[in-house]
Amino acid sequence: MYSTSKEIIMIGYSTIGVKDIEKAKKFYCDLFDATVQVDVGRLAMIGKSADAPMIAVCTPYNGNAPECGNGTMVAYTMSSKDEVKAKHAKALSLGATDEGEPGQRIDDVFYGAYVRDPDGNKIAFYIFG
């Protein structure tokens, strides 16, 4: 049964596995002009504030190498198509690899761009419209 509640469910944070925690903290802090909100050594939560959505980077708890999920992607909403373009370019300048240049993906519905961070995690920047 689906809920009929009008309450919006908001993601608090998404976690991705990384090889080098210091390199990952720098990449995401620089990419989003954000800061580390929580740092417990093998895990760091990065965002604008601790009460807003964050990205968490961590070395896997089991000690194994991190693996990118097949079909897994973290998508970040932008305020304009120009911001999608700028964030894509900034990610590339910080060492990300291109997975799809900025462009209209669904006519009049979805404009996006895709990269992989230095650990291979797929990221999207998008705006509806």
Predicted regions and their residues:
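Hydrophobic pocket/interface hotspot
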Residues: 24, 28, 84, 91
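Vicinal oxygen chelate
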Residues: 1-7, 11-19, 49, 65-129
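Conserved acetyl-CoA-binding loop of GNAT-fold acetyltransferases
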Residues: 30-37, 96-97
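Conserved active-site alpha-helix within GNAT-family acetyltransferase domains
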Residues: 22-31, 113, 122
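N-terminal beta-strand motif that seeds the catalytic metal site of vicinal oxygen chelate
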Residues: 1-25, 52, 74-76, 129
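Conserved short beta-strand elements that form part of the metal-binding/catalytic scaffold
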Residues: 35-69, 123-127
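A cross-family glycoside hydrolase active-site/sugar-binding cleft signature
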Residues: 58, 75-77, 101-102, 126
